[in-house]
Amino acid sequence: MSEYDIAKNDVTYTKLDTIECDIPINEELSWRINKFVNQLRISYSTLEEFVDNFVYELKKGLEAHRKHPNLWIPHECSFKMLDSCIANIPTGQEKGTYYAIDFGGTNFRAVRASLDGKGKIKRDQETYSLKFTGSYSHEKGLLDKHATASQLFDHFAERIKYIMGEFNDLDNKEVKSVGFTFSFPCTSPSINCSILIDWTKGFETGRATNDPVEGRDVCKLMNDAFVRAAIPAKVCCVLNDAVGTLMSCAYQKGRGTPPCYIGIILGTGSNGCYYEPEWKKYKYAGKIINIEFGNFDKDLPTSPIDLVMDWYSANRSRQLFEKMISGAYLGEIVRRFMVNVLQSACSKKMWISDSFNSESGSVVLNDTSKNFEDSRKVAKAAWDMDFTDEQIYVLRKICEAVYNRSAALARGTIAAIAKRIKIIEHSKFTCGVDGSLFVKNAWYCKRLQEHLKVILADKAENLIIIPADDGSGKGAAITAAVIALNADIPQLP
C-alpha cells in the first residue's frame, strides 16, 4: 500500500505528525516493522463505527439506569453510567480553604486548596507512594490483596493530618471539609456515600482479608480513619477524577470561555463524565454522569498482543478498552511489540513484563535531541541495552503506532460524548482533559486536538478542548467548597 493510500484510509496515520527518523533500514526489518504496526492502524470507517457504537452504548446505559438506578448489570451495558449526585457547578466565586485526597493511581496526594473567589486557587500538596510504604511488607504495598482497608485509609488520614499540621489547621476547632477523589468504579446513592464496585488498574487492596474495600462506602471508611486519628476533618463529597476535571475546568476556565460539559481523564487510567441533558428522564439525582468507559467492549480494533495482555492481567476479560488506551498499559504494549520485532536481538531485561513504562514512551515520542540521545537513555535505563540506530528506529515507530492508536480512540470517545450531548449542534462548549498522557505529552496532545475535525467535521469548532489544571486535586476541593458553602449556585440547565 502506498503512503497516499495509508493516509487516506488510516486515521492513525498523518504524514505531518509521523516521527522524522532518517535512519536507513534494511528491507527485512522494514517488513517486520510494518507487519506489526499494521495491527495498530485504525481506518476512518472503523473509527466511525467505534463512535456510533459508543453513542449507542451511552443510550443503553441511560436506559438501564432508568430501569434500575444504581445497579449495574454488565450484560445490559458495558458502561456503568454512574450518578455523580452533583447538581450544581462552581461559579468561580467560591472562597475559603478546603482539603482534598486524590487517589487514582499508585501514588496519592494530600491537597490543601485556598480559593480566592475569582477563579484562582492556591494549592499546597504532598505526594506519597502506596507501593513502597515502609510499614508494610506486602509485595504491592497498600495496593496488595493482603493489605486491609483500615491500613489504606489510615495512611490517607495520617498524610492529611501532616499537611494540616503544616498550616496550623489542627489547632483550629473548625472541622475542615474534604473532597475525596476516588477514581474507581463506585455507586453513589448520595454525594457523601460512594460504594466501590470493584478495583481496576490492577489494584487489589483487601481482597484476601476480612477487611476489604470492595462493596463498602469509601466515604465512611475515610471518615472513620479521621476519627481514629483524631483529625478535625470530614469528607463531604466523593467523586472520581473525571468529575473533578469537569469541576476544576468550570471554576478556572475564565470569563468568556464556553461552559464545561465534558471531563476526560487520559493518564494511568482513562474515564469520562459529561452533562446529561435528560438526567431527570433517566432518574439521576445529579446532572453529571460518570461513564466509566474503560470496560467498553463493542467491536474494538484489538491486536493479538492486546488479547495476550488481557490474558495475563489481574482483571482478565474486563477493562479491555482501558488496556488499549491508558498509560498503565501503553509501555507494556510497546515492550511486547518490540520483542516481536527484535526477537533474538532483545536483551534479557526486554523479556521482563512492565520493564518499559508509558513515561518512557512519551520521552521517545517527544525526543528532538541530537542522534535521539534521550530515546537511547530511556531504552538503556529500562532494558540495559545500547540500541543501534536501527533499533532506535524500531522503538520510535512502535511508540508512534501504540500512542497513535490510543489518541485515535480517545478522540473517538470525546466525539461520541459530544454527539450525545447534542449541544454541539448549535453552540460552543468546553471539554476539560486531565492526565499525564495529555498534559505531559505534547506529541499526544497535538494528535488528539488536531484530528477531532476528522469525526465532527464542521461541528468541531464548537468543541473547545483545554488542559485541566489538576482536576483530581483541585476539582475535589472545589466540589467540597460548592457543597460546604451551600450557596445559591446556578444549576446546569
UniProtKB/Swiss-Prot annotation:
Pathway: Carbohydrate metabolism; hexose metabolism; Carbohydrate degradation; glycolysis; D-glyceraldehyde 3-phosphate and glycerone phosphate from D-glucose: step 1/4. GO terms for molecular function: ATP binding; D-glucose binding; fructokinase activity; glucokinase activity; mannokinase activity. Residues 240-470 are annotated as: Hexokinase large subdomain. InterPro entries: ATPase_NBD, Hexokinase, Hexokinase_BS, Hexokinase_C, Hexokinase_N. ATP binds at residues 102-107. It catalyses: a D-hexose + ATP = a D-hexose 6-phosphate + ADP + H(+); D-mannose + ATP = D-mannose 6-phosphate + ADP + H(+); D-fructose + ATP = D-fructose 6-phosphate + ADP + H(+); D-glucose + ATP = D-glucose 6-phosphate + ADP + H(+). It comes from the Eukaryota. Keywords: ATP-binding, Glycolysis, Kinase, Nucleotide-binding, Transferase. Residues 177-203 are annotated as: Glucose-binding. It is an enzyme of class 2 (transferase). Residues 27-481 form the Hexokinase domain. GO terms for biological process: glucose metabolic process; glycolytic process; intracellular glucose homeostasis. Disulfide bonds: none annotated. One of its GO terms (cellular component) is cytosol. CDD domains: ASKHA_NBD_HK. Its EC number is 2.7.1.1. Belongs to the hexokinase family. Catalyzes the phosphorylation of various hexoses to hexose 6-phosphate. This is Hexokinase. The lineage of its organism: Eukaryota, Sar, Alveolata, Apicomplexa, Aconoidasida. The gene is HK.
